[in-house]
Amino acid sequence: MNFLIIGGDDRLLYLAKMLLDDGNTVKCYALDMAKLPEGAQHTERLDNADCVILPLPAEGKTAGTLNAPFSAKSHSIYEILSSFEQGSLVCGGKLSPKLREAAEKKNLRLRDYMMRPEFTVGNAAVTAEGAVSLLADNLKSTLFGSSVLVIGYGRIGRLLAHKLRGLDAETYVLSRNSESRALAESMGLHAVSPTADNAVFSAFDAVINTAPAMVIPSMEALKKSCLLLELASAPGGIDRERAEQLGLRCIAAPGLPGRYAPISAAGLIHEAIRNILREEKHE
């Protein structure tokens, strides 16, 4: 099969290697400053391919531009989409509604690999492991015996809380959802309500947020040595400006898999794309 990889970070470079190892042909566009794996080809042309692969996220910090940190210039993602023939298969991650609309007008088969269960579950596991590593590197004490609050009890929050408990950290879970709090307690974790007394929050050595909205009732209650770790995408759930005013250390770490374990993250994209291809009858 012929693949065209467009933009992206280390994850898509490792993905290119995996696709080559499968016996495919791989061309790379908007990766002009990257060292490609042996066998991959740089291209300046947006040629048609059996499968076009966009990065995760597909768009850069400026809406409408391609996420292409290894390219010397900016690229319009809409111009890129418009260059492909109708019916072309295009796979990308975290695709915006506007991007979907543009693909639909062009009659492209746009597929979001980030939305697939095999990706989301694996990505949560990699994120949780990366968060534990980041926490261990930045805490001024061992995880053993530390009091850690995990905000949110979704896929990432659940895996993270149980990894921390396995390392003998005193692990607390804050959730607005009473069922999630009950589930956390049934699994041997401490559950905290957003309406809990401020004194509860004064004991934490670290607070890790996985929720998209701000739910820390009172940052003033946290002790000065408390480490804040933000895993949610912008705007996140931690008021970083307020944290700075209070003298609290805050580390923003969205997209952790791409930084902590790009090979594992590439493997998840690889698996998702192979499954998409099977469903699209390309394999």
Please identify what each model-predicted range represents:
Residues 3-43:
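N-terminal glycine-/charge-rich "phosphate-binding" loop or analogous flexible N-terminal tail
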Residues 3-14, 19, 144-164:
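Glycine-rich adenosine-cofactor-binding loop
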Residues 9, 30-32, 96, 176-177, ...:
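Residues in the short beta-alpha loop(s) of Rossmann-like NAD(P)-binding domains
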Residues 22-37, 167-187:
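NAD(P)-binding Rossmann-fold cofactor-contacting core
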Residues 50-51, 89, 147, 205-206, ...:
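Structural motif
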Residues 54-144, 253, 272:
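Glycine/serine-rich phosphate-binding loop and adjoining beta1-alpha1 elements at the start
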Residues 57-59, 73-84, 184-258:
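Rossmann-like adenosine-cofactor binding region
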Residues 94-111, 232-277:
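Rossmann-fold NAD(P)-binding glycine/threonine-rich loop
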